[in-house]
């Protein structure tokens, strides 16, 4: 799975308790920082410093993760799940796409997908919380990442 991550957006990553998750980057990992304790999650940098392996060691609520590569910084919110966890993630840089096609349409919202981002359109008169960002009308988001609307995972 490929995540096209837009600058300064927090990406939610779902981890499985008995599953190794790898995140591969285009450039070398310089450092990473986890906000929780070492007893919660195992981390190891591999593959010529371009891949970070992650494995939860216990159940619970996890903290956030910052990964700094030679070219960019990436912010992750780590969550434990027993279904649809991420395994192999390739991280690319996202950009706001303008050639878009419809991916999801409901009476309340639409999700349009481009080559390196998605556009979330709010069709209501009320604000929506999407990936911890308030969307009044429309907002670009990283492509490939989970889309969480008002606390519920609706895509990826």
Region roles according to the model:
Residues 1-156:
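A general "mature secreted/periplasmic domain" signal
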């Amino acid at each position: 799975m490929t995540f096209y991550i837009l600058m300064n957006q927090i990406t939610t990553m779902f981890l499985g308790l008995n599953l190794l998750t790898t995140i591969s980057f285009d450039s070398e990992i310089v450092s990473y920082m986890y906000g929780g304790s070492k007893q919660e999650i195992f981390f190891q940098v591999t593959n010529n410093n371009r891949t970070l392996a992650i494995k939860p060691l216990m159940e619970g609520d996890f903290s956030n993760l910052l990964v700094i590569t030679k070219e960019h910084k990436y912010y992750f919110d780590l969550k434990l799940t027993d279904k649809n966890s991420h395994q192999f993630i390739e991280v690319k840089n996202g950009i706001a796409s303008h050639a878009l096609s419809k991916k999801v349409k409901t009476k309340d919202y639409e999700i349009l997908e481009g080559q390196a981002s998605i556009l979330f359109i709010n069709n209501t008169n009320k604000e929506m919380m999407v990936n911890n960002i308030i969307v009044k009308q429309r907002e670009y988001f990283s492509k490939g990442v989970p889309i969480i609307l008002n606390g519920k995972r609706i895509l990826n």
